[in-house]
Amino acid sequence: MKFLLLPPAVILFFAAFVITGCSTANKTASKKDWVPLFNGKDINDWIVKIQQHDAGVNFGNTFRVANNTIQVRYDEYGPEFKEQFGHLYYKTPFSYYHLKLEYRFVGEWVKTAPTYTLRNSGVMFHSQSPYSMPKEQDWPISVEMQFLGGLSDGKPRPTGNMCSPGTEVMQKDSLVPSHCINSTSKTYDGEQWVSAELIVLGDSLITHIINGDTVLQYSKPQIGGAVVNRYDPAIKKDGQLLSSGFIALQSEGQPVDFRNIRIKDLSGQYKSKQAKL
């Protein structure tokens, strides 16, 4: 059998072609892995739950859509905020995933809201269902990736923190006693868009990422602790690990915009690895 010897230049050309083709295929597959949770047009795939109102009631048109963003506004609330804290839940729960979104604080804070809500919002995850919350319950039993905006006073105010309404988490093999853990992020003043990412591996490791930088990690999210009121006692089973739950965007007195909300399912990748351990 005779073999055809090709010039080195020709071999390099075909090798580059194959590598480029594989790279393009991988990038295409990677892009397809990301699923948008917000279509830029409406919130039909989302469920509103606002304190003092039943699930599904978008009181005061709190959550609305404009310019391909979910906008949180309070202009129809009247003179008093009355602690009508709200959350906008995606319709299905998740367990192992990588969530990406962008947010920005805009406009005037509602002065009748609690002072801690100034330039404050967040995304709740591993949350109880909105339909399991009594009308008067303030926060869902969940874990929060808290978003804070700088106050333009030169003082640090990190974002991408962790807060734990009705939950607890672990760091260095110990339960964290505080309600919130500050991240190592920079401070973001004004109305600039900030990119936030959340990597959730069931009831194992949780990672917070802000503008591409890993700013916080912890593990073993579980039900426990306080800072949640008027809940159904049957739901709050202290010590129960949280391996899945709903994702929700927060409204608590500060106008905020959300956009480019998308998710990548990691369950196939990580559950199979854990099963082999």
Regions found by a protein language model. Give the residues of each.
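Bacterial Sec-dependent N-terminal signal peptides
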Residues: 1-30
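Carbohydrate-interacting regions of secretory-pathway proteins
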Residues: 22-277
